Amino acid sequence: MMKNLNGRTHNACYQPYYQQQLQLQQQHQQQQQLQQQQQLLQQQQQLQLPYAAPYNQLQQQQYTQQQYYQQQLQQQQQQQQQQQQQLLRQQQPTLSVYQQQQHAKQSYGHNNSNNNANMTQTARSNMQTASIATVSANGNNSSSSSSNANAANSATAAMAAMCQMQSFLSQQQQQQQQQQQQQQQQQQQQYHNNCAHINYNQQQQQQQQQLQQQQLSTAATTNGDKLALDNASEIANFLASELFMQQLVTFDGMQSAPTLTTPTLTPTTLRTIEETIYELTTEPQIVPFQAGFKPPPLTSLGAITNNNTVTPTTAAAAAAATLAVVNANPINANPQFDLLGLNCNSVRGSDTEDSNGSWNDGQLNDDQSTTDTSSAATDSTSYQNGGHMLGNGSNGGVNNFTVALAAVNNAGRASGQAGGNSTTSNSGTPARRGGGRRPNKAANMSPEEEEKRRIRRERNKLAAARCRKRRVDQTNELTEEVDALIKKGEDMKKEIENLNATKNQLEYVLQAHRPTCQKVRNDLLSVVTCNGLIAPTTLLSAGSCTGTGSQHSNNNNNNSSNNNNSNSSNNNNNNSNSNDSSSGGTITGFDATLNSTGRSNSPLDLKPVLTDEQLLQHIKNEPQDVGLDSSSSLDQDGPPPAKRCFALPNIAALTASLTTPTDPGSCSLNTPITSTAPNIFANFGGDLNSPTLNALNKLPKARPNTLNVQQLQRPFVVQQLGNDGNKAPPTQIQGVPIQTPSTGTFNFDSLMDGGTGLTPVSGPLVPTCSSQNKHPLELPTPTSEPSKLVSL
């Protein structure tokens, strides 16, 4: 959107786009018409009757007359178009836009020439009034009030012309649409009226003629649109001139206005605007230095002789050289390459022979690496002025002329300074640029010294070349080593990724296999001992258990796996002591086995398994403090020894005689030893795996509060196993001697000193509430406190 001086926007510049839209709409309508005609032809072929032949001649005559009239109309339209084009060439360019639009609209075959002429005349009159207003505004600069009024009038006239243009275009569009609709309706009526009388050949002829007419009309419209698009620049000129005519520019208090002959936007300014837009839309061409080589900067355009003396040229010669370069290469994007080729002898820091040798491709040396800096002594003014002639070479082809002018100015300034000082390069010594050896004068040097200098320079060049080669080789070695290390690191990363992938895959397979694994379940239901200790499952899989170990399965007398699973789950969930669920000949401590194998995070707890020789030496590792550790009986209790069970004939008599709950083996040291026993023990010696005793052990029992030490009425008579059958009291049970005190009363001192073979490791046993709460189901001893006695 363009804006005028008042800040208002207008859409006048968008008319070419609007014409393109109209052209697309027309093409779409033509395609629709062709489709409709094809459909009608198909319908007519279906409805064609055999008696339609007599009417063919009349229809042919009518058709020839219509074609003759149409040809005459086309000829008239072509003549009118030619006349109007001739008038356009003679008239102003601003008026050609309206006439071209009229041509484009008349090419459709409409008879609107009079209306178009009237509209163009009104537009011309408005344009003339606008120009007259601007002229009057330019002429009346004496008074500010009159100039402002004329400017306002010119602005209003320009806006009126714009409005008339828009209204004219909109009216023409409406007329075109109406006429197209009328033509379509007429064609449809003709087809419907003559559908029964048209022959197939005549239909084809009419169709071909209509297609030709449509092609002619579309060609005319496209030509008109092309003309309108070509004159878009003229529309822009007209709008710019009309909008910026009334602009008044003040220069130091003086008012001046642009004249009609020199408008504010001249063709040159418009051309520059177009060029800038084109450069912005196109991609800039970045031309780097060829093969990555940046040429050295040039000095002033002068010739350096073999005696290291600079003879500066005049400004005219420098200008001629630069202009010759610019004229020879007007499209070159980098003129410094041509300047290099033209002034190859003016390179700083070398003579003619040395420069030719350094620019040779076969050698590896150049002039910048020499240690002898006598040839590098040049004029500082020429370096400062001539060193910036070429720029950086990245500006492209835009500022070629400015670069050449800068080079000419710098050369002229250098020559002017040299002439003003009235000193020549031959007589005076040039100023030095920094450190280095003091340059020797050419007049004081003999040929021998010159030869020595030349040899020294060659030697220095060779040394510099060797140094560069060594540095390049070292750099290449380091880069190769770095590449090898990078490759090695990448390989290690890939290996780590592969190992992680395999690890994740194995973990996934293990997790998927764990629910369906039968070996884990069998291990959970079995106890394996190694050297008298319970071995975990990991040792079983590793095969570390040798012949000294013994494996026992926890089976009840029912020999069913269902009871096994139910008993194990109940014991594990309740954290009960394992002494209650044992049967004769089996290893108890199933709770500890589950804890050691099922819990992978808990520490390894190895419990001793008692053999037949160690039945009465029950080792029970208990902590010395009140706190619990891994060996406490709350979660991991060692298995008690296997005991021999005797059948009880009467359960009621047994419960009445025994006040404290004991295990089936009455010979355990965990129970108090009384002097007398009930008479029912004389019947022991039956089945060791009695179901009655197992049922008795599973019954819930009350915890006693005191130790029953009363002497019973009947003497304790036990038939000793393995004796000849005498009725004497037993002196030993399974090889362990039994020594009973003479009295029937027991206290703490008598228990400690009574010759039982046990010594205390702590103070007196005092039951506490916390210990009773912690061990609600542990009933191996008369007290609720765990046993604090160890075997000697």
Swiss-Prot record:
Chief subcellular location: nucleus
Name listed for the protein in its UniProt record: Transcription factor kayak
Complex formation: Homodimer. Heterodimer with Jra. The kay-Jra heterodimer binds more stably to the AP-1 site than either of the two proteins alone.
Described purpose of this protein according to its UniProt entry: Developmentally regulated transcription factor AP-1 binds and recognizes the enhancer DNA sequence: 5'-TGA[CG]TCA-3'. May play a role in the function or determination of a particular subset of cells in the developing embryo. It is able to carry out its function either independently of or in conjunction with Jra.
Compositionally biased residues, Low complexity: 370-387, 553-583, 624-637
Recorded GO MF terms: DNA binding; DNA-binding transcription factor activity, RNA polymerase II-specific; RNA polymerase II cis-regulatory region sequence-specific DNA binding
Pfam families documented for this protein: bZIP_1 (PF00170)
Lineage: Eukaryota, Metazoa, Ecdysozoa, Arthropoda, Hexapoda
Phosphoserine: modified positions: 602
Species this chain originates from: Drosophila virilis
